[in-house]
């Protein structure tokens, strides 16, 4: 399929920035605005790409979430959720806090994904991204890991039920996408593939390779847990070697992918040692798989990524650039973007597209880590021989 035939959507509205737990919370949607403006200054993101989100309906939310949970989020939006209910629904800790109008702002993220899905399925668009989404930890009846409504899981269910699609989810966030996995654990119409930092040391503690699905869904969950301090070469080797046979075996109609960028060595919440090289390459790999197996149909979500100044805007820009068929840029970042945002930044902004390897430490256990990771890959590959 030539680039001229492809049309790409980019979900954005300033209202998406209102999904905010507190001013000090690490989940900061300002990263979405930074990425959007970087792409615009680059001259690649145009107004015709923009897909406006909407507020998802309760029926749409209930494709995954329990009715009582949705009502609890509504109550929390107005500050009338009891202490016992807050504990029951996962809203009593410091990770996933209650905030005003949280139902509306969370449902808007879901609605953006569904608008994009409809336009792809109608043929108006070939592909698209929703970098403000990717809330893959939320469980059917419980908030979890900064996530209220699981827009990834809802989109998968929506594509399955409304359009009868076989959906492959590729999740490369450093944290295992537990909410998405458990939502489809007994289903054989969705395959959930996740490559992530091992749950031995990182939230949510799940994603072991033995978690393969259950009942008719057995074999439709694929987990690749990686060792802490995994670097570019090992990550990409394992990813490339395992994802192709998974896709070829499952034969999806559409791909949904989660592009958390928290495997970067500067991310404050994880223990991985990848650079921008890995984060730049991943969306191009996923795009190539979509072109080969799904006539180009793919929805790319954001996800984790908590160094919002030095990592996320540059990394997420490549999600959109991959979708429109542009090669990764080189050289300096747009001067206007740097000039606008440096006064607000909590650090000195990077001035070019490449990592300067600031504070990067060569990992002494590189060989050992790579061997452990490849053993995990071999176990998974044996299932698809």
Swiss-Prot record:
Record carries keyword Oxidoreductase: no
Alphabetized UniProt keyword annotations: Acetoin catabolism
Biological process according to GO: acetoin catabolic process; epigenetic regulation of gene expression
Superkingdom, taxonomy of origin: Bacteria
Annotated GO MF terms: histone deacetylase activity
UniProt xrefs under SUPFAM superfamilies: Arginase/deacetylase
Transmembrane segments annotated in the record for this chain: none
Gene3D superfamilies: Histone deacetylase domain
Known pathway: Ketone degradation; acetoin degradation
PANTHER family for the chain: HISTONE DEACETYLASE HDAC1 (PTHR10625:SF10), HISTONE DEACETYLASE HDAC1-RELATED (PTHR10625)
Task performed by this protein: Role in growth on acetoin or butanediol. Involved in the breakdown of these compounds used as a carbon source.
Homology family: Belongs to the histone deacetylase family.
Stated name of the protein: Acetoin utilization protein AcuC
């Amino acid at each position: 399929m030539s680039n001229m035939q492809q049309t790409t959507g980019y979900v954005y509205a300033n209202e998406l920035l209102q999904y905010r737990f507190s001013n000090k919370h690490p989940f900061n949607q300002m990263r979405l605005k930074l990425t959007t403006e970087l792409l615009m200054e680059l001259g690649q993101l145009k107004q015709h790409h923009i897909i406006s989100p909407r507020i998802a309906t309760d029926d749409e939310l209930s494709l995954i979430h329990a009715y009582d949970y949705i009502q609890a989020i509504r109550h929390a939006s107005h500050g009338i959720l009891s202490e016992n209910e807050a504990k029951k629904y996962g809203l009593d800790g410091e990770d996933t806090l209650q905030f005003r109008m949280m139902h509306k702002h969370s449902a808007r993220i879901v609605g953006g994904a569904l608008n994009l899905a409809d336009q792809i399925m109608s043929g108006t668009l070939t592909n698209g991204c929703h970098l403000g989404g990717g809330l893959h930890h939320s469980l059917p009846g419980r908030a979890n890991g900064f996530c209220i409504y699981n827009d990834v899981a809802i989109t998968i269910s929506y594509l399955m039920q409304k359009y009868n699609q076989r959906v492959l989810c590729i999740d490369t966030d450093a944290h295992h996408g537990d909410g998405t996995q458990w939502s489809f654990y007994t289903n054989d119409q969705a395959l959930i593939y996740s490559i992530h930092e091992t749950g031995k040391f990182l939230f949510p503690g799940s994603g072991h390779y033995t978690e393969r699905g259950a009942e008719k869904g057995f074999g439709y969950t694929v987990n690749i847990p990686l060792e802490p301090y995994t670097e570019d070469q090992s990550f990409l080797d394992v990813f490339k070697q395992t994802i192709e046979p998974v896709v070829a075996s499952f034969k999806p109609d559409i791909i949904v992918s989660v592009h958390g960028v928290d495997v970067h060595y500067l991310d404050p919440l994880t223990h991985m040692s990848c650079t921008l090289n890995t984060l730049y390459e991943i969306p191009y790999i996923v795009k190539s798989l979509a072109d080969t197996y799904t006539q180009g149909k793919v929805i790319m979500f954001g996800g984790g990524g908590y160094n919002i100044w030095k990592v996320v805007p540059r990394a997420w820009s490549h999600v959109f650039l991959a979708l429109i068929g542009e090669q990764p840029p080189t050289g300096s970042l747009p001067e206007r973007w740097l000039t606008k945002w440096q006064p607000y930044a909590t650090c000195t902004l990077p001035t070019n597209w490449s990592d300067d390897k600031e504070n990067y430490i060569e990992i002494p256990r590189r060989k050992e880590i790579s061997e452990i990771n490849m053993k995990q890959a071999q176990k998974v590959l044996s299932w698809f021989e």
